[in-house]
Amino acid sequence: MSKKKAEDKQPIIKDEAVEEPKSDSKVNALSAKIAELQQQLDDSQNDYLRAQAEIQNMQKRSQKEQSALAKYGAQRLAKEVVPVMDDLKRALQVQVDNDSGQQLKTGIEMVYKHLEKALNDNDIKEIDADGVAFDPELHQAVQTVPADDDHPADTVVQVLQSGYKLADRVLRPAMVVVAQ
């Protein structure tokens, strides 16, 4: 036989790593360290998730505030303008006998209409009250009268002062007389 074939027939000895038996204390220490690191990782992940949730909540809150500001931003101005509308309405109810008074009344009517349009353009609307069913959210009853055929119970008989709404928010309820 040739040398190569003889070498091929020799038993192959594998290099096996001989493991030293580890002591239980070393295994326990490593297991404890792994558990500690796993706990730290879990805590960090929980903190991260909480921070993400807080950021999302802050963004939602900010969007709500911006939406409310856009929707109700004119509220302060509207509350100050509404009494002016009342004064202009009262001025328009005055009877005039001469031309100069009529011209003045026409000018007041123009101002009233422009102001009313500006309020409507900003979603500030007069509350419909005359002849409608009494709604305590929209109307403030300042007087009651007996109900009759023309005015059934719980309906508005007369509007003493107009009420106004900004979008879905009541700025001032209408002061009304209600049939009982």
UniProtKB/Swiss-Prot annotation:
Its main subcellular localisation, reduced to a broad class, is: cytoplasm
Transmembrane domains' residue ranges: none
Could you list this entry's UniProt keywords, alphabetically sorted: Chaperone, Cytoplasm, Stress response
Q: What does this protein do?
A: Participates actively in the response to hyperosmotic and heat shock by preventing the aggregation of stress-denatured proteins, in association with DnaK and GrpE. It is the nucleotide exchange factor for DnaK and may function as a thermosensor. Unfolded proteins bind initially to DnaJ; upon interaction with the DnaJ-bound protein, DnaK hydrolyzes its bound ATP, resulting in the formation of a stable complex. GrpE releases ADP from DnaK; ATP binding to DnaK triggers the release of the substrate protein, thus completing the reaction cycle.
| Similarity annotation | Belongs to the GrpE family.
User: What name does the UniProt record give this protein?
Assistant: Protein GrpE
Subunit structure, as described in the record: Homodimer.
What gene is this protein translated from?
A: grpE
- The segment annotated Disordered runs over 1-25
User: What's a BP term from Gene Ontology annotated to this protein?
Assistant: protein folding
